[in-house]
Amino acid sequence: MRFVDYVSIEVVAGKGGDGIISFRREAHVDKGGPDGGDGGWGGSIYFVGDSGMNTLLPFYQTKKIFGYNGENGRPKRQTGANGKDIFIKVPLGTQVFLKKSLICDIILEKKYLIAKGGRGGLGNFHFRNSKNKAPRISENGELGQNFYLDLQLKVMADIGLVGKPNAGKSTLLSLISNSKPKIANYEFTTLVPQLGVVKIYENSFVTADLPGLIQGASSGKGMGIIFLKHIERCRAIVHVIDFGSDNKNPIKDFIEIKSELEKFNKKLLDLNQIVIANKCDLPNFQFNLANFKRKFPKIKIIKSSLISAKQNEINIIKEKMFGLLGENQKKLEIQEINTSKIEFNLKAPFLIKSRNNGFFEITGELIQKIIQKIPLNSQENILRFNAKVKKIGLWDELIKKGIKPGDLVRIYEFEFHWN
């Protein structure tokens, strides 16, 4: 399956159902009164973390997600049915961004609210009072939340394998896990992160094989800048370094890799790290190993020839790697964020655009919310709408801008002549 770790999508939660104007009409029931029911809630959109997924490919093919609308109210005070909520599976490690701000970090196998459905409108039964016993007032359902989102996947792995291209990372992953990455004797065989579950006794952990890093990866060279983000969630790092091949300098390789990790995220250097010194069967190995130990005496090193490793060597490597994940191992900070607090941003109540030909166009989130919520289908609803817009100062502002009787005013889809 194609690996996709970044997509842009639009989510539109369901609109709430409209409340209705209705009066009880039954034989032998005089003056039955208002009985218009409320609209149902619009369906919300949730993301659900799924450990079985490892790509955002489904979102690459589906750019828009729409929620189900709530049903309109009915006579006899019957509330319309709520719109069905939508639950969409996403890979664990998916981050959701709204206007470049992180609003949701999906790190657990549970549901996360992404877009909330609109509230259902009230029927005329709710507007009865001692002064108005037969109100012809109702409300439309509110629109569901509508967001343009960026999704970014950072794989959820306990240990990240890093190293220069063709150092043996894919070979190691194939030996210690059930993963079957592509292995070949040329650089950049691994083009996307590969995950494998490593079992050791009654325990297990997830290891990620990241594409080979080169000097300058943190600033965009090679493929490193694309995939370095995937190591940010790891709890430990294993360096796989070629100690035996000709023209290889393990000290230089190790310094360059650590430098790229530090430039990308300094916290990565705080993680437990070990080095797997690969290709111990080649002539240059002992010389390079001795120099490396003198330069980095405190670094833990595991000697191996991965291509011909025996099972007991593989078990030792697995034990050493598992040992990096002790209970006291400090994890990188992962903040779980939920979008339930996201609301529409009502910065300005309205914006007036005027033209020389006596035309005024009114826009703005608050005025849009008012015109959308109050249906202009009765005299009482029109009076209620008039009171709402007068309260926010729209009429006064139009007068200041020189509106004259007969001028045309447009508020989204609603037009009228000023009187």
From Swiss-Prot:
One GO biological process term: ribosome biogenesis
Signal peptide positions on this chain: none
Main location per the UniProt record: cytoplasm
PROSITE patterns with a match to the protein in the record: G_OBG, GTP1_OBG, OBG, OCT
Subunit structure of this chain's protein: Monomer.
Family note: Belongs to the TRAFAC class OBG-HflX-like GTPase superfamily. OBG GTPase family.
Protein name per the record: GTPase Obg
Gene that encodes the chain: obg
